[in-house]
């Protein structure tokens, strides 16, 4: 065994466990963990901007199902040859455990669901988009760990020290099952861990968003535009390293082309959006007004309890009380 082999990154022996007849999929657990972290972080960021943190959970309730549906639709459209061929079963297109989700479909349909909810509640969307952006990219980073468990979305074979070992996995009947099976211990390839490259890139963009938002007090949707630009820039070069089957457009993998187009649009939007950040009262006017009214009521109640007459304190009258 050489040094390169010793330094290689091992894949997990399996990505699916069973609790009786119920499959526990590591990929799904990673996605759920990412969603929980994103909600937690967004609540803190949205409240700091002046918004109602309870709105974040409401938005997640509509965004997550829509995002899953949108992600699946995008995946099926861009990889339609896997589901609509002579030997394919079109029903497999409905099975999200077969092939996974596409991030752009999740962002688009999930974003539309949140937009509709905020429009219904008459709450400005831009401050929320800026609050949620770091949480989204962090959730994507966590979700990429699911690809590690599934032994998928990797690049060409390599002998670099950080190469990923791909194991031969089999099901209970001994048949080859790279995603749902259990490792035999046999290494069948060492490859570029492109999922890891994207995870690290996403963490880098997460740090950039947090820093830029604090340093420049970004608002009006600019944090979200920066997230889109940063993510697509990384996806553009990482996508070209992948070797899994993909739909080709103009000689490029379709996600490479989509990333290039979306990156350009995101940069244009970022440059055209207004500078500065919304005042807390602009983030959610109704919530801010309700908070101000509640504070006034509590102040009046405190004055009544202490016997202080509002507007008639020593500080306001300039007289000492004896």
UniProtKB/Swiss-Prot annotation:
Where exactly are the transmembrane stretches of this chain?
A: 21-41, 50-70, 98-118, 123-143, 191-211, 254-274
Membrane topology per record: Multi-pass membrane protein
Q: Which residues form a coiled coil?
A: none
User: Where is the protein situated, by its record's location annotation?
Assistant: Cell membrane
One Gene Ontology term of the biological-process aspect is: lipoprotein biosynthetic process
Entry keyword annotation includes Nucleotide-binding:
no
Instruction: Give the top-level enzyme category.
Output: transferase
Q: What is its EC number?
A: 2.5.1.145
- Give the GO cellular component terms, alphabetically: plasma membrane
Pathway annotation? Protein modification; lipoprotein biosynthesis (diacylglyceryl transfer)
**Renumbered residue ranges of the record's region Disordered:** 283-322
> Which UniProt key words apply to this protein?
Cell membrane, Membrane, Transferase, Transmembrane, Transmembrane helix
One Pfam family here:
LGT
The residues the record assigns to binding a 1,2-diacyl-sn-glycero-3-phospho-(1'-sn-glycerol) are 144
According to the UniProt entry, its GO molecular function terms are:
phosphatidylglycerol-prolipoprotein diacylglyceryl transferase activity
Q: What does this protein do?
A: Catalyzes the transfer of the diacylglyceryl group from phosphatidylglycerol to the sulfhydryl group of the N-terminal cysteine of a prolipoprotein, the first step in the formation of mature lipoproteins.
Q: Which family does it belong to?
A: Belongs to the Lgt family.
Q: Give the protein's recorded name.
A: Phosphatidylglycerol--prolipoprotein diacylglyceryl transferase
Q: Which gene encodes it?
A: lgt
């Amino acid at each position: 065994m050489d040094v390169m082999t010793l330094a290689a990154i091992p894949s997990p022996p399996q990505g699916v466990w069973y609790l009786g007849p119920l499959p526990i999929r590591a990929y799904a657990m990673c996605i759920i963990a990412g969603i929980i972290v994103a909600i937690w972080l967004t609540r803190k960021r949205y409240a700091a901007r002046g918004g109602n943190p309870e709105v974040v959970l409401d938005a997640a309730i509509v965004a997550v199902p829509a995002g899953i549906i949108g992600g699946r639709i995008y995946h099926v459209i861009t990889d339609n040859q896997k589901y609509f061929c002579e030997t394919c079963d079109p029903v497999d297109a409905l099975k999200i455990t077969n092939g996974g989700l596409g991030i752009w479909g999740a962002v688009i349909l999930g974003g539309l669901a949140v937009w509709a909810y905020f429009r219904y509640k008459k709450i400005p969307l831009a401050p929320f988009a800026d609050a949620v952006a770091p949480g989204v990219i962090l959730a994507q980073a966590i979700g990429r760990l699911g690809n590690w468990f599934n032994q998928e979305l990797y690049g060409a074979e390599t002998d670099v020290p950080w190469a990923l070992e791909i194991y031969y996995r089999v099901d209970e009947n001994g048949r080859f099952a790279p995603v749902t099976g259990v490792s035999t211990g046999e290494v069948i390839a060492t490859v570029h861990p492109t999922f890891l490259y994207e995870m690290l890139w996403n963490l880098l963009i997460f740090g950039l968003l947090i820093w830029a938002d604090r340093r420049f007090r970004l608002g009006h949707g600019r944090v979200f535009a920066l997230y889109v630009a940063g993510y697509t820039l990384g996806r553009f070069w990482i996508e070209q390293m992948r070797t899994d089957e993909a739909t080709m457009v103009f000689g490029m993998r379709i996600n490479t082309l989509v990333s290039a187009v979306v990156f350009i649009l995101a940069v244009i939007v970022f440059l055209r959006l207004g500078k500065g950040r919304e005042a807390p009262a602009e983030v959610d006017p109704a919530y801010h007004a309700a908070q101000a009214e509640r504070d006034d009521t509590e102040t009046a109640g405190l004055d009544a309890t202490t016997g202080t007459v509002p507007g008639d304190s020593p500080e306001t009258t300039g007289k000492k009380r004896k």
